[in-house]
């Protein structure tokens, strides 16, 4: 199941973008549990402690039974010509074995860039293109294939969390 909803205001998104980020070239996990540069992912990312923004996000995520955030999350930055090819966030068992859901929040105003759509395929290969509204959250199973299309112009920022079952209240059915 894929859930989408606007959960942050324009001002809240800008607050996250304006944090003191140290952007570095994004890396991907390898089968050997290493993080390596790859031609499949050309964006930049800043790893931040989730506690920096948990007070802002958690109250808005409770209805999805999310009761905590992982220790770290990342802010991804895509500029012209950058993308992330089709992949799964639950790729390697030795690295991602606990990833359950992926949560991505669109931080940029969609007028600030062209291209860069987030495309997700469900188990039946049906395609969903994420809403690009500023503050839009998309929550999906980490095993689903997805990609960030190439940015044609401008800059796109997103906030990314990899959730485990530990982050969910489990006395209710999970989404």
Question: Where do the protein language model's features map onto the residues?
Answer:
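Catalytic core of non-heme Fe(II) oxygenases with the double-stranded beta-helix
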Residues: 55-175
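Non-heme Fe(II)/2-oxoglutarate
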Residues: 1-68, 72-74, 83
């Amino acid at each position: 199941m894929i859930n989408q909803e606007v959960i942050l205001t324009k001002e809240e998104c800008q607050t996250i973008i304006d944090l003191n980020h140290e952007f570095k070239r994004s890396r991907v996990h390898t089968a050997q549990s290493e993080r390596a540069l790859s031609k499949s992912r050309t964006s930049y990312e800043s790893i931040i402690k989730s506690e920096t923004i948990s007070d802002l996000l958690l109250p808005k995520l409770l209805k999805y039974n999310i009761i905590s955030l992982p220790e770290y999350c990342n802010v991804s930055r895509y500029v012209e010509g950058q993308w992330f090819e089709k992949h799964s966030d639950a790729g390697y068992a030795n690295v991602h074995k606990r990833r359950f859901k992926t949560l991505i929040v669109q931080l940029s105003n969609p007028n600030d860039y062209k291209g860069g759509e987030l495309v997700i395929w469900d188990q039946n290969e049906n395609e969903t293109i994420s809403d690009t509204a500023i503050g839009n959250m998309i929550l999906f199973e980490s095993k689903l294939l997805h990609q960030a299309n190439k940015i044609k112009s401008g800059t796109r920022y997103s906030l990314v969390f990899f959730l485990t079952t530990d982050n969910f209240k489990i006395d209710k059915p999970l989404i």
